[in-house]
């Protein structure tokens, strides 16, 4: 029997978080097969990664609208990234990046999604001595993407990246450097807990983002041991998820947490564990409020 919690009273801290699962769990499976598994395992949302068979073509968008309505699953969109680079020194690559992300934004609009996740650019080894130019390119491309998002009423969630050589947007400070000159309410951060763990303490990462005034609008969850982007099941790495969830509640986050594991079995287990952790956090908060009354 599930234990009861002291959460019946209204609380500014007790906020509902929804648990989603990423296309990364399913690719290259079909949309139908993926959605059936999502519904079977009671995920609240599906983060569609616009790659391969899950690219948001007009045909796929129409079909996803039917699946979404049939299974009553919320859709979040992750823009394509594998062959693209918003910071590229090649103008044609930057233009292609914008057009592909435009497809994701338009698809998100059709699917009633609020957020499109976007990766910042990276510095190719050939251009490692041209960081200033790379950053300028990244700014120009992201600015154009945000303008498109504003036209559709979509929010762009710029994702923090793992601590790999040449990657932009690894730390809160580097994210600030990217977004500081883009004045738009349609731009925020997709906080990737696993990526943050390769760059330090994920809970402190949340606090730093809050302190420098960058809002978290979406969250990715997976585990690792701090050295590589392993996408392990929750509990198999060294991340203190209870501490991270506490920080997310402190800043008032009540959106989707998308689970990014390597298979559906791990994703389902991760969801179960995260729900248990969230219950623990809620109980701690309720007890704290009781003491303060």
Swiss-Prot record:
Gene Ontology MF: a single term: zinc ion binding
Any one Gene Ontology BP term: DNA repair
A Pfam match: AP_endonuc_2
SUPFAM superfamilies: Xylose isomerase-like
Protein family: To M.jannaschii MJ1614 and MJ0008.
Protein name per its UniProtKB record: Uncharacterized protein MJ1311
Organism expressing this protein natively: Methanocaldococcus jannaschii (strain ATCC 43067 / DSM 2661 / JAL-1 / JCM 10045 / NBRC 100440) (Methanococcus jannaschii)
